[in-house]
């Protein structure tokens, strides 16, 4: 496992809970919801077949943990983090878990800043 980016101050216990914890749910379970995120980690790992994948795991202010390997959601979230870092601004805490349909009618997850 290789950590790409994470919330400042994340402890080893936090990293374990977000990347290996049994209570981490699928981000798709939060589709349509606004999540108030207090911790995140973006990391590279391998799937069960040994193929590389990038995973985003988050923890909300009420302790719920979600993870996804959705390329669109991860790209959206990473772009938000990069833009706010470049502007030396604090990262927003509220994010909308949205969805869309591809041309081949497959559903995918999206991430946006909640107002």
List each language-model region with its residue ranges.
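Short, charged beta-turn/beta-strand-edge "cap" motif at the junction between a beta-strand
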Residues: 87, 95-115
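Short nucleic-acid-contacting surface segments enriched for D/E, G, S/T with interspersed K/R
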Residues: 30, 75-96
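A short macromolecule-binding patch
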Residues: 64-69
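OB-fold ssDNA-binding interfaces and closely related basic DNA-contact patches used
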Residues: 1-63, 104, 113-115
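Compact, Lys/Arg-rich rRNA/RNP-binding cores from ribosome-related proteins
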Residues: 72
């Amino acid at each position: 496992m290789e950590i790409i980016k994470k919330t400042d101050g994340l402890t080893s216990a936090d990293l374990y809970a977000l990347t290996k914890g049994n209570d981490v749910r699928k981000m798709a379970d939060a589709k349509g919801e606004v999540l108030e995120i207090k911790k995140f980690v973006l990391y590279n790992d391998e799937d069960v077949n040994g193929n590389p994948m990038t995973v985003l795991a988050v923890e909300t202010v009420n302790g719920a943990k979600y993870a996804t390997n959705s390329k669109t959601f991860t790209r959206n979230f990473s772009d938000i983090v990069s833009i706010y870092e470049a502007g030396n601004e604090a990262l927003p805490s509220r994010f909308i878990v949205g969805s869309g349909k591809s041309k081949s009618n497959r559903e995918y997850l999206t991430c946006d800043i909640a107002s």
